[in-house]
Amino acid sequence: MSRSPLIARTVPALRRAADNLRKRKATIALVPTMGALHDGHVSLVRLAKRRASRVVVSIFVNPTQFAPTEDFGAYPRTWKADIAKLAAEDVDIVWHPGVEAMYPEGFATRIVPEGPALAGLEDRFRPHFFGGVATVVGKLFTQCRPDFAIFGEKDFQQLRVVTQMARDLDLGVKVIGSRTVRERDGLAMSSRNVYLSPQERQTATTLYRAMKDSAGRIRAGEAIASAMARGAATIKAAGFVLDYFEARHAETLAQVTSRKDGPLRILVAAKLGTTRLIDNIAV
């Protein structure tokens, strides 16, 4: 039988609840989300439960990672459905702050990540994004003080940036990546998929097919540049506006020219209509 999670809306309330768990020798896993939860998020919660004895899920649509032209105001907010999903998974605490709790009046500090994970992918097209992500995740880590934090591999560059930040700042949190959950036709689950029209939803599967085709060609010995050019052409022909479609080193995100350069990851970002989709797969 599921139970309702404790809902914390202020930092002191969250810390009291988390401290009470620690007093009982609990280990804590944090699952940061922006809400609009789907089965991909549920998979993160289930991984968190396997890694720790107690689970905290944060729901906060973070304004600092959106540019003025992006979809902060329109981002789906489904609070009642989210809580029902989390209760069904026996989540212990839901951290649901308002903007004023995360960024009170006078807030003036920002974490700006640098280094190899800033590899000219999302950071090239959304230069504001990772500063906003690093700042809010850094705050979530210091507010909750979890032992583990679970992030989806769908946002692969974000996973690398957050892992680097936690290590560099000695935050004492082990960041764990969770495999991307897909629809039956291969589309990566995303809260933004609700923006797609029925026709766009059918077309959106092109991203996964193009990645799989390019990955297969690379494994078969085709030159990376050739295989990636084929995939990019397929995506554009389907009607996408392509931001990037690249093969990178899976650990460092450095550019590669040969399979011998190390384990590879194909990453893509493209806009279909008004909806921007991102995805990635291992080669």
UniProtKB/Swiss-Prot annotation:
<keyword id="KW-0963">Cytoplasm</keyword>
<feature type="binding site">
    <location>
        <begin position="189"/>
        <end position="192"/>
    </location>
    <ligand>
        <name>ATP</name>
    </ligand>
</feature>
<feature type="binding site">
    <location>
        <begin position="34"/>
        <end position="41"/>
    </location>
    <ligand>
        <name>ATP</name>
    </ligand>
</feature>
<feature type="binding site">
    <location>
        <begin position="152"/>
        <end position="155"/>
    </location>
    <ligand>
        <name>ATP</name>
    </ligand>
</feature>
<dbReference type="InterPro" id="IPR014729">
    <property type="entry name" value="Rossmann-like_a/b/a_fold"/>
</dbReference>
<protein>
    <recommendedName>
        <fullName>Pantothenate synthetase 2</fullName>
        <ecNumber>6.3.2.1</ecNumber>
    </recommendedName>
</protein>
<feature type="binding site">
    <location>
        <position position="181"/>
    </location>
    <ligand>
        <name>ATP</name>
    </ligand>
</feature>
<dbReference type="InterPro" id="IPR003721">
    <property type="entry name" value="Pantoate_ligase"/>
</dbReference>
<comment type="function">
    <text>Catalyzes the condensation of pantoate with beta-alanine in an ATP-dependent reaction via a pantoyl-adenylate intermediate.</text>
</comment>
<comment type="similarity">
    <text>Belongs to the pantothenate synthetase family.</text>
</comment>
<dbReference type="GO" id="GO:0005829">
    <property type="term" value="C:cytosol"/>
</dbReference>
<dbReference type="InterPro" id="IPR042176">
    <property type="entry name" value="Pantoate_ligase_C"/>
</dbReference>
<feature type="binding site">
    <location>
        <position position="65"/>
    </location>
    <ligand>
        <name>(R)-pantoate</name>
    </ligand>
</feature>
<keyword id="KW-0547">Nucleotide-binding</keyword>
<dbReference type="GO" id="GO:0004592">
    <property type="term" value="F:pantoate-beta-alanine ligase activity"/>
</dbReference>
<comment type="subunit">
    <text>Homodimer.</text>
</comment>
<feature type="active site" description="Proton donor">
    <location>
        <position position="41"/>
    </location>
</feature>
<dbReference type="GO" id="GO:0015940">
    <property type="term" value="P:pantothenate biosynthetic process"/>
</dbReference>
<feature type="binding site">
    <location>
        <position position="158"/>
    </location>
    <ligand>
        <name>(R)-pantoate</name>
    </ligand>
</feature>
<keyword id="KW-0067">ATP-binding</keyword>
<feature type="binding site">
    <location>
        <position position="65"/>
    </location>
    <ligand>
        <name>beta-alanine</name>
    </ligand>
</feature>
<dbReference type="Pfam" id="PF02569">
    <property type="entry name" value="Pantoate_ligase"/>
</dbReference>
<dbReference type="GO" id="GO:0005524">
    <property type="term" value="F:ATP binding"/>
</dbReference>
<keyword id="KW-0436">Ligase</keyword>
<keyword id="KW-0566">Pantothenate biosynthesis</keyword>
<comment type="pathway">
    <text>Cofactor biosynthesis; (R)-pantothenate biosynthesis; (R)-pantothenate from (R)-pantoate and beta-alanine: step 1/1.</text>
</comment>
